[in-house]
């Protein structure tokens, strides 16, 4: 009967990934400032929620509440359609 040795992966030193990355407390920027509705013409605010590659940053990363995230998505899509914000990073303004 052949016996096989199990390789113990636990011998490798474990890194604490949470301490390596600085985690700040996420909060909804729109709730704090008292914004009732997000406007598609406010391009500076919209750019804060668009990644470098042109994708919309999810609420779990930005901390935006669900109601404002839906408004934000609609506003970004309207601004893209009207060419106020580029669709991707390949398009320069």
From Swiss-Prot:
Pfam families found in the cross-reference section: Ribosomal_S18 (PF01084)
GO cellular component assignments: cytosolic small ribosomal subunit
UniProt GO molecular function: small ribosomal subunit rRNA binding; structural constituent of ribosome
Matching Gene3D superfamilies: Ribosomal protein S18
Key words, A-Z: Ribonucleoprotein, Ribosomal protein, RNA-binding, rRNA-binding
Any GO BP: translation
Keyword match rRNA-binding: yes
Keyword set includes rRNA processing: no
InterPro entries linked: Ribosomal_bS18, Ribosomal_bS18_sf
Protein family: Belongs to the bacterial ribosomal protein bS18 family.
Job of this protein: Binds as a heterodimer with protein bS6 to the central domain of the 16S rRNA, where it helps stabilize the platform of the 30S subunit.
HAMAP family named among the record's database cross-references: Ribosomal_bS18
Annotated protein name in UniProt: Small ribosomal subunit protein bS18
Organism (species): Verminephrobacter eiseniae (strain EF01-2)
Lineage, uppermost ranks: Bacteria, Pseudomonadati, Pseudomonadota, Betaproteobacteria, Burkholderiales
